[in-house]
């Protein structure tokens, strides 16, 4: 693990995701730079996976309403010891957030059911906490990730 600027990494992940995205992705951070010890490639994988999951959820909404516009809001807040990342989307939500963390469980025709368990494992390897829940039934997902912060 090495010292990385999480704000910069998320911005890069968003730029990469936007190349194939039709959704609106908003990003807000109270700090211009926030440092953590991490594996840049693995954390990038986390952020891309979470954005991709939202995109896939939006497809179901678009089937019901062709004018639907997917929105992903990503926000970082920090205190003295931890940063908290919040990913919110306005997709269909997750039927059972606990089951979604079970390897090989999927509700998608093409999914492997490994995305969220891998994301959780990567966050745990970074001494972090990964939480997932619905904002409201059928109204989107809220994912919270806490990671230990280090000094600049």
Give the positions of each predicted feature.
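Short conserved segment of the HATPase_c
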Residues: 94-104
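Glycine-rich ATP-binding loops of the HATPase_c
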Residues: 127-134
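Conserved micro-motifs of the catalytic ATP-binding
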Residues: 35-38, 107
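Detector for a conserved hydrophobic position within an alpha-helical segment of the HATPase_c
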Residues: 123-124
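A conserved beta-strand-to-alpha-helix junction within the catalytic ATP-binding
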Residues: 2-14
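Short alpha-helical Gxxx[C/S/T] motif in the catalytic ATP-binding
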Residues: 115, 119
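Conserved catalytic submotifs in the C-terminal HATPase_c
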Residues: 24-34
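ATP-lid-like helix-loop hinge signature
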Residues: 55-78
